[in-house]
Amino acid sequence: MKYISIILLAWMTFNRAGQDLYVCKNARINLFSSAPIEDIKAVSQTGASVYNPTTGQLGFSVTIRSFQFAKSLMQDHFNSDYMESDKYPKAIFNGTVKEPVDITKDGSYPITAEGSLSVHGISQKRTIPGTLVVKNGVISMEASFMVKCADHHIDIPSIVFHNIAESIKVDVSATYTKYNPTN
């Protein structure tokens, strides 16, 4: 809730009050790394997102420590050795959905979000393809993309080079509800 409040406050600063905003407090974000020795999977179900269908503005935020791994040792290494989660606690995307979407009509809309992805303290411009689905007034969004560790200065020691891929697959799934400031 804390992060959604921060995102909303930032959005309210730049957007006119009263515009329809949609929020998601439990976006699911999967990480997958395939390497010769082992595959590594992690999931967070606490991502926060805000979408403004009028302007196309889209924001995501996830706490790095919220990712859960099958092996606790992997999770410890992820947070302390690679992501430095105490120093860089969140990954954030701020951008715009380029295609206009009529949220009053049910349908599946291919979309492209352009913006900045900040991971490990390094921001990179990204163009992320995805799908926005409107069904019975419910908006959901899915996206899948690759992130190179080197793009965000995430160093992989040579001793574990065969354990961790140079690029991580990221899958995002979010279902939105209309923002109600009284909730």
Predicted regions, residues:
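Low-complexity, acidic/polar, glycine-enriched regions of mature
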Residues: 17-183
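Bacterial Sec-dependent N-terminal signal peptides
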Residues: 1-21
